[in-house]
Amino acid sequence: MATLAKTPASSTNKAPAKAPAKAPAKPRAARSPTTKAATSTAKAKAPAAVAPSVSASTSALTITSKNYSSWSMRGWLLTRFSGLPFTENVLPPDDPSTRAEILLLSSSILVPCLVHNGVRVWDTLAIAEYLNEVCPDAQLLPADVIARAHCRAISGEMHSGFSAMRSSLPMNLRAHFPKFKIWSRAQSDIDRICAIWRECIETYGGPFLFGEQRTTADAMYAPVCTRFITYDVKLDKVCQAYCDLMLAQPEVKDWIEAAKSEPADIDELDVEF
């Protein structure tokens, strides 16, 4: 094979002289693969252009009644605040399992439930923590460590507390009860919620609970704002301004509009107190 390799090299100068005349044909043929490579590169960029729709198709949020379910509202607002595209799956409120959750008869609340890229997350606070990790630019938790701890604490308090208010002032966006009489235990819950709001707005400057950025806490307390409207709860100026601000958020307005057009009623909740 060494001899064959030397044979072309040891040829006379006449062979190379003819080679250049034929050589252009070969380079021209060689240009064809280069063109194909450019074409394939252009095709490779196409999936990037449709990446947002792919992301949306791999994220789904399961909720139930928009009129009655405060937990569904919290999970939905968190997902909207995060900026994560998602499809919405709505379970009918007359489904036995979801009905039990809305009526506070379920031992565990599994709605809302977020599925994102194969990861299934339920429980509103778990969804909030997950969204904060996958969508950090949304800043669902404050950057400052002390503010972040405070945000988690009051979100947890909303998550596990205020049972008297929940049971006596259930969420019902289509209803309105002027001069609704609030019993003492529910009033204690309302007083505590207002104290939380005032402390946060005074500490972090407002207009939201932790400053200029909406956080997990705002999503957690948004359904309370709707309850205060439904049951005609009187608030001080600071708390009323915060309620008005939250009810004016585009995402909250979208939710309320959808709730008003929701066909299903739950007789146990859709009554005059």
Residue ranges and their predicted role:
Residues 28-31:
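Basic polycationic patches enriched in arginine
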Residues 259-273:
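Acidic/histidine-enriched, glycine/proline-rich intrinsically disordered or flexible terminal extensions
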